[in-house]
Amino acid sequence: MNIDVWIKNITQLVTVQAHGKPKKGKEMQDVGIIQDGWIAVAGDRIVGIGSGEISADFQVGENTVIISGEGKTVTPGLIDPHTHLVHAGSRENELALKLKGVPYLEILKQGGGILSTVNATKKATMEELVAQSKKSLDRMLSYGVTTVEIKSGYGLELEAEIKQLEAIHRLQQQTPMDLVSTFMGAHAIPKEYKENPEEFIDLIIEEMLPAIKEKNLAEFCDVFCEEGVFSVDQTRRILEAARSLGFKNKIHADEIVPLGGAELAAELQTISAEHLMAASETGLKMMAESNVVPVALPGTSFNLATGKYADARKMIEYGLPVALATDYNPGSCPTENIQLIMSIGCLYLKMTPEEVISAVTINAAAAIDRTQEIGSIEVGKKADITIFDAPNLYYIPYHFGVNHVDTVLKSGKIVVEKGNVI
């Protein structure tokens, strides 16, 4: 077989082979390392992997792109399964307020917090929204991310939510990355509905969800299930309505108080449940039985400086397939750097480097229902490959705060070279 790309002499090839399934519990430690490895790519697919000399089955021709992996660590393309990337404006002024001890609710009363992002996003033109978001996507790509999930939720009304989701579709035409759209109109309750939140929930169910489905603008529906936002019963109503229309379910669950979001995720068998810092042991065990992927967002805990992180060790003990994501947003986690999240995962969630690699590849793929296509280096899978200028996988989270990416392939094409987006 003639091949288009040959990555040879790979010092450490981290395949994360999983046969189309997430890695649960102790399985996360097994990342399928091959020393002195090679990868053969034809078209947009991986057609061969091995160690030492390339198999005689593959023909390296004059048009084959040859990449040296000497001194490098090669992993599946990284996946960021939870972001709020499409938004306008920024909130750096809140850092000084936070340092002075001003509570978030007080910032909200002053017109800051999520409401300032909602207002900025509503005012922004489509062109402004796309231009700002494209910069963030390019940063993510430079850090080795080849697939990213993006939520709406800074509109909180039909027209503005549609604008965010349409921006995601425009961005897909401008990036080689795969973008996964999530409708999150239930991100907060608008101030005009504070006295009657049920009216807003009716609006989501009766108007927003059908309109977004008709335009085919989102694959997933997500709800912020939290005290003072959407109750368990309200969340159930929205997610069941979304599922009846064909949306897959996600849930922001038990971030601040143990409300029962993890239990609801298990009951509804959502694809994933995110945050989970306050999730009960019962809820986590139920999630394990229902094959729900927990998505930990340690960058948010780090930035909020609360000292409270999701209990990843307990999740792994219960046999859950832990995923990690940036939660990139302008308020609680303004970073596109998935490598930093990997370091925080090791240092604060006490995950091993192997577990962290599983969490940003195959388990992140499971959190967006993509394990058959991406998340591991296996024959037949999409050739999404990240090459790090690092001698082994341990070096990536160990040497934190810098970008270790040398080269990124997306669907078999080089899209980052020498650390720069092409």
Curated annotation (Swiss-Prot):
> One GO cellular component from the entry?
cytoplasm
Q: What class of enzyme is it?
A: hydrolase
List positions binding Fe(3+): H82, H84, H252, D327
Task: Give the binding site residues for N-formimidoyl-L-glutamate.
Answer: Y154, N329, G331
Q: Which reaction does it catalyse?
A: 4-imidazolone-5-propanoate + H2O = N-formimidoyl-L-glutamate
InterPro entries, alphabetized: Amidohydro-rel, HutI, Metal-dep_hydrolase_composite, Metal_Hydrolase
Pathway listed for it is: Amino-acid degradation; L-histidine degradation into L-glutamate; N-formimidoyl-L-glutamate from L-histidine: step 3/3
Name one process (GO BP) from the record.
L-histidine catabolic process to glutamate and formamide
Query: What detail does the entry give on cofactor binding?
Result: Binds 1 zinc or iron ion per subunit.
Question: Which GO molecular function entries does the Swiss-Prot or TrEMBL record give?
Answer: imidazolonepropionase activity; iron ion binding; zinc ion binding
Tell me which residues bind Zn(2+). H82, H84, H252, D327
The alphabetized UniProt keywords are: Cytoplasm, Histidine metabolism, Hydrolase, Iron, Metal-binding, Zinc
Cofactors: Zn(2+); Fe(3+)
Pfam families, alphabetized = Amidohydro_1
Which EC numbers characterise this protein's activity in its record? 3.5.2.7
Which residues make up the binding site for 4-imidazolone-5-propanoate?
Answer: R91, Y154, H187, E255, S332
Main localization category: cytoplasm
- Give the matching CDD domains: Imidazolone-5PH (cd01296)
Q: Where in the cell is it found?
A: Cytoplasm
* Job description of the protein: Catalyzes the hydrolytic cleavage of the carbon-nitrogen bond in imidazolone-5-propanoate to yield N-formimidoyl-L-glutamate. It is the third step in the universal histidine degradation pathway.
NCBIfam families associated with the record: hutI
UniProt cross-references to PANTHER family, sorted A to Z: IMIDAZOLONEPROPIONASE (PTHR42752), IMIDAZOLONEPROPIONASE-RELATED (PTHR42752:SF1)
Family per similarity comment: Belongs to the metallo-dependent hydrolases superfamily. HutI family.
Q: What is the name listed in the Swiss-Prot or TrEMBL entry for this protein?
A: Imidazolonepropionase
The taxonomy runs: Bacteria, Bacillati, Bacillota, Clostridia, Peptostreptococcales
